[in-house]
């Protein structure tokens, strides 16, 4: 006697097996993804405050700032790095800013895991032609004043400038 299983049972078993496989894959890859994210954040901190040899995480009391680290060299504070997430034209943009003790920008890093700006336009905000112009500047920054916009990406360029100004204001208020 040939007995067929109802289609809903077969479909349910396939869904159960697929769900278990996805859950197992997530369980195995989650620690690796977290480790890579931490390494990427550390690399960004070191790029924007290159004189620092160590970083010490600080408590953040500002909802706009994602995190802030004190940059140290020979046990002395030489500056700060902070990350802010701003809303660009294509979505969220993570901006890591390095600032020395005098409030002067030592570098910025633009991007993030969810960076989805338009290729050839907003994506150019990640390029050195845009990010390098921030080095040596201090607050207040203005688009078309002391920072040039990326052509065709004024929304994203403006969001980044506003985010950097927010970080500069935050760092200026820290006890040094």
Residues covered by each model-derived region:
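Flexible, solvent-exposed loop/hinge segments and secondary-structure transition points
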Residues: 2-176
């Amino acid at each position: 006697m040939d007995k067929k299983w109802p289609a809903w049972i077969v479909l349910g078993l396939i869904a159960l097996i697929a769900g278990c496989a996805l859950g197992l894959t997530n369980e195995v890859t989650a620690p690796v993804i977290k480790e890579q994210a931490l390494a990427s954040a550390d690399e960004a901190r070191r790029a924007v405050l290159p004189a620092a040899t160590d970083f010490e995480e600080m408590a953040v009391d500002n909802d706009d700032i994602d995190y802030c680290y004190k940059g140290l060299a020979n046990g002395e504070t030489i500056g700060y790095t902070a990350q802010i997430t701003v809303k660009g034209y294509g979505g969220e943009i993570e901006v890591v800013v390095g600032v020395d003790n005098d409030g002067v920008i030592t570098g910025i890093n633009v991007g993030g895991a969810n960076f989805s700006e338009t290729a050839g336009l907003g994506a150019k905000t990640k390029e050195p032609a845009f990010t390098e112009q921030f080095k040596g500047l201090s607050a207040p920054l203005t688009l078309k004043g002391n920072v040039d916009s990326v052509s065709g990406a004024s929304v994203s360029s403006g969001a980044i400038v506003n985010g950097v100004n927010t970080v500069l204001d935050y760092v200026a208020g820290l006890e040094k």
